Amino acid sequence: MRPTPEMSFAIRHFGCQSGINITASHNPREYNGYKAYWDDGAQVLAPHDKGIIDEVNKISSATDIKFEGNKDLIQIVGEEVDSVYLNKVKTISIDPEVIKRQKDLKIVYTPIHGTGMMLIPRALKQWGFENVHTVPEQMVKSGDFPTVVSPNPENAEALSMAIDLAKKIDADIVMASDPDADRVGMACKNDKGEWVLINGNQTCLLFLYYIIKNRIAMGK
């Protein structure tokens, strides 16, 4: 069980032709399905998507499917990839000194029962954050996503347990990832001390602003 972005990285790292991920993504369990990725680490696009579906539609029964390839050419993403991926992630920090000054930032994180639990707490600690708290009830692996109606981290309902914990421990920020950890949800306190959600567009703009501002300051 590993995050989708790690699989995308692994495809490029190992020079694979394609990648497969079984996930419901940020949807309820009924949407569990098959994500296919091409050699660039991105989801399959035209014309390859049509070619794949054309072959699928030729299958009349699951018993018709026979694997005749070399099993040694199939790489399961695991601890070996984790180490390489986390080391790569660590290098993309814009300004490590900022993290050192903010190492006590109190972070609440929830993977909503998904793959983020495998790497995100480790990545945060590897970057230098020393005050990371997870939501125990949602650190349990489960494809049923039993504590939420829908595991979309941009929905208030999915972040309710994390925000409750944040209020209890007086955290600075809440972070959540969807079950395959390619979507993030965040919450912070406004100037009245009320917890508010930051949607995906706002999060992206904040990241972009920070990156551009700091690269200019560093003359890059």
Mark where each language-model region is.
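Short, glycine-/Ser/Thr-/acidic-enriched flexible segments
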Residues: 2, 25-27, 41-42, 49, ...
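Gly/Ser/Thr-enriched, mixed-charge loops and adjacent short helices
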Residues: 32-158, 165
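Well-ordered alpha-helical segments embedded in enzymatic catalytic cores
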Residues: 6-7, 84-88, 158-161, 203, ...
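Short Gly/Thr/Asp-enriched flexible loops that form oxyanion-binding sites at enzyme active sites
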Residues: 31-38, 182-200
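Short, surface-exposed connector motifs at secondary-structure boundaries
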Residues: 98-106, 170, 215-220
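Proline/glycine-rich low-complexity loops and linkers
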Residues: 59-81, 190-220
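Short glycine/threonine-rich loop-to-helix capping motif typified by GTGT followed
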Residues: 9-13, 115-122, 188-190
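N-terminal small/polar loop signature for handling phosphorylated ligands or for N-terminal nucleophile
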Residues: 1-31, 130-186
